[in-house]
Amino acid sequence: TMFFVISGFLITHHTLKRDKQFSAINLKHFYIRRAARILPCLVLLILGVSILGSFDLKPFMNQAPNGIEVSYPLTIFAALTFWMNILIIKFGWVNYALGVLWSLSVEEVFYFVFPLLCLLTRSNKVFIAVFVGVILYGPYFRSLHFGEESGAYLYHYFSSFDGIAVGCLTAIFSHKYQPNWTYKKPLSWLIILSMTALYLYAPIKEVSTWGISLFALATGLLILCFQHPSETQAHSLFTKVMVWLGQRSYETYLFHLVVLGLMKVAFIPAQTDSSIKIMLLIGYLVLTFIISAAIEKYYSTPLNSYIRKVFIKDKS
């Protein structure tokens, strides 16, 4: 939920910063930027999982958790056309390493609609009203699927759209009002403690109807508390680390299960002594960050820049 809110905030913030108003958005350029950021890593993930699966490594092969076989080509098709979440709802988590793409499916469908909505509404008030409607519809939709074993209350598009919409509205608010609250620090700690309490209160399955909405709204407030002018430089070590991780969050998210899958092959969980699991966890985190950084530096960022340079001729 937090990542959906942050994603919605960033895409709206950058749109307003670049185009000044939603009606001025360049549809072609928007889609090119999205493709340049998303597709290189997505294709690399699919190729990597396909190669590893060809060696009969279970975490990278399709399974049948609900007793229904799903072909690997169909899984790839779902990944490339952004309905992996629907595949998981219908057939379960059919591929361990590719399952993470459910959230990417949600985001990309939303962002396919986002620029169209910008052009069709023309009015900021109508634009905001649509997002408010999405936010209100979210808990109702989750209530319709409350407790379902399919996980539709979590994986479906309309189960998560409200989080992205909260992020979009947060960006609109901050762009217009640029709040400079003197009580940001105590408020941020209060929000963090409240979110922690909500997280520990009950499993998400039991509080999905309202819990996801509250978490999204709290995340939006937290973004406002931590927002700084774009020219502000990170000074503390913690801030620098968080910025570094944030810049590579997409690569980390997409490939963390590849690393974990390989470790599960080498160290079968049921047969691994608990005394070394902490060391494995540390090794897993370090290896994931190293691989993500390498992919970002030598693959995704260069390709992102190249695609934009070729297909976007102006400086926007």
Task: List the predicted regions and their residue ranges.
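Alpha-helical transmembrane segments in multi-pass integral membrane proteins
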Residues: 2, 10-29, 51-55, 86-93, ...
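Hydrophobic transmembrane-helix microenvironments that flank and shape a buried ionizable site
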Residues: 4, 10, 31-37, 82, ...
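Transmembrane helix irregularities
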Residues: 6, 39, 51, 105, ...
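Small-polar-interrupted transmembrane alpha-helices in polytopic inner-membrane proteins
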Residues: 7, 125-144, 188-197, 288
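Membrane-interfacial loop-to-helix junctions in multi-pass inner-membrane proteins
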Residues: 20-43, 60-73, 106-113, 121-129, ...
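Hydrophobic alpha-helical transmembrane segments of multipass membrane transporters and ion channels
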Residues: 36, 40-44, 48, 251-255
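Hydrophobic alpha-helical segments with transmembrane-like composition
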Residues: 38, 86-133, 157-161, 171, ...
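Membrane-interface helix-loop-helix regions
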Residues: 46-104, 137-152, 162, 215-220, ...
